[in-house]
């Protein structure tokens, strides 16, 4: 989960996270697990309920907010991959050698799912959950056959696929609003970062260590986060924009794309102007204006999350027209700094116009630009079908998904061997589960994930202890 950079109060940041689509989909998944496991327990008993709960857990990772029409395609691959893996582990039983010969190559193939990017990673996790939690099932101790245990597992997966598809339809309207709000928060963070570039020397004199260390790196990171956020929002908001509320949200998303384009276009002008001291007063004024616009965009996002009508603000255009420009340099070749500064001010003015228009559309004071929505919605939506083309490009040593899959398979093999060699009694799946949820494509991401897992485990233990 990407948290946009903000200077908001921690309580407000917490409220945004608590109301986000990440928490909403988590609540939906938890409710589905409770309903399915509880229902199976009442009808078939505790062992069937435990196996069905594992099926639900294995089906959960691909369950993300998605267009209604593509939801089933998003979930079914986890069932197709997870069922044979679960049965294979159950069929092998307690034979440690055969089990190792299954889980190591299966882990390699599962982690190759990263070839499909953000769509494939949840499928990889789902496959690994099917393997790991199948090891944890005490099937033989209960006197239940491998096939019957797998049937309970399949029951849980199947019921959750149905539940998640229905839940996605029910929550679709809320997902649209929250995805747009998250996109607005991301673009507000990018506006703040871009504003900091206007007076980089002034920023370096402050205590903002992030600006001093790597302003360009942070800018690139937030641009990448915004691109991911925009694509996820496009897929949901631009699906069947037929009702007035959907058209309003889709129109606002298209305007957000235009704001992103204005921000990207201003980067070159900022780089050329930041070292011209004669234009520093203008750049300081533009920075303040852009930061004020970022606050207005954040307020708009908060209003969408809370279901309130956003409050309009006064245009900054009059203040921009009163800026005092430095004199032109006659000896300059090409565009002078004064011309670049005026162009930059004009782009900030366009951002002001788009922000005003966004709020007007959100309030219902102005209709969305339906012509833009109709012209672009099919072009921006990602395909929902699966293709084998990413797999064909994997088989070379410099392919990151292939190298990640090899690292993962070696880590799983090492962890499994260590768990068997430990002198005290242990459960091998504990080690394998830790590797699966922590290992990422780079060492830095793995360390970050490890720290998050340690903190999450500690927090969960405290909460569980408090409940007990």
Report each predicted region and the residues it spans.
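Pore- and pathway-forming membrane helices of multi-pass small-molecule/ion transporters and channels
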Residues: 2-11, 26-71, 75-86, 100-165, ...
């Amino acid at each position: 989960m990407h948290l946009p950079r903000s200077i908001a109060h921690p309580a407000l940041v917490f409220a945004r996270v608590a109301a986000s689509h990440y928490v909403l989909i988590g609540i939906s998944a938890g409710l589905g697990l409770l309903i399915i496991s509880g229902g199976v327990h009442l009808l078939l008993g505790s062992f069937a309920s435990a196996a069905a709960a594992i099926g639900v857990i294995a089906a959960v990772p691909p369950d993300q907010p998605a267009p209604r029409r593509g939801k089933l395609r998003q979930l079914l691959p986890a069932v197709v991959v997870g069922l044979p893996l679960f049965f294979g582990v159950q069929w092998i039983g307690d034979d440690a050698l055969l089990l190792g010969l299954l889980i190591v190559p299966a882990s390699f193939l599962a982690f190759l799912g990263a070839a499909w990017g953000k769509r494939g990673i949840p499928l990889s996790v789902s496959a690994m959950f099917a393997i790991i939690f199948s090891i944890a099932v005490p099937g033989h101790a209960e006197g239940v056959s491998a096939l019957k245990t797998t049937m309970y597992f399949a029951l849980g997966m199947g019921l959750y696929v149905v539940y998640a598809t229905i839940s996605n339809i029910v929550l679709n309207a809320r997902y649209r609003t929250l995805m747009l709000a998250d996109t607005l928060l991301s673009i507000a963070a990018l506006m703040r970062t871009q504003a900091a570039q206007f007076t980089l020397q002034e920023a370096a004199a402050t205590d903002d260590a992030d600006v001093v260390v790597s302003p360009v790196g942070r800018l690139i990171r937030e641009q990448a986060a915004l691109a991911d956020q925009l694509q996820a929002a496009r897929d949901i908001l631009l699906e069947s924009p037929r009702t007035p509320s959907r058209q309003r949200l889709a129109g606002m998303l298209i305007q957000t794309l235009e704001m992103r384009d204005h921000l990207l276009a201003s980067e070159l002008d900022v780089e050329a102007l930041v070292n011209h001291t004669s234009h520093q007063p203008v750049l300081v004024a533009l920075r303040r204006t852009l930061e004020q616009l970022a606050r207005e965009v954040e307020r708009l996002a908060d209003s969408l999350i809370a279901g309130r009508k956003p409050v309009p603000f006064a245009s900054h255009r009059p203040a921009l027209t009163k800026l005092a420009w430095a004199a032109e340099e006659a000896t300059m070749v090409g565009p002078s700094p004064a011309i670049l500064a005026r162009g930059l001010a004009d782009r900030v003015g366009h951002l002001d116009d788009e922000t005003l228009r966004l709020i007007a559309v959100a309030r219902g004071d102005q209709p969305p630009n339906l012509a833009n929505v109709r012209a672009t919605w099919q072009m921006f939506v990602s395909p929902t079908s699966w293709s084998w083309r990413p797999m064909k490009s994997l088989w070379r040593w410099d392919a990151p998904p292939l190298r990640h899959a090899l690292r993962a398979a070696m880590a799983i093999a090492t962890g499994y061997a260590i768990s068997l060699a430990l002198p005290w009694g242990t459960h091998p799946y504990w080690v394998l589960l830790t590797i699966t949820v922590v290992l990422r494509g780079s060492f830095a991401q793995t360390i970050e994930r490890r720290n998050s897992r340690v903190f999450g485990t500690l927090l969960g233990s405290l909460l569980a202890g408090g409940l007990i």
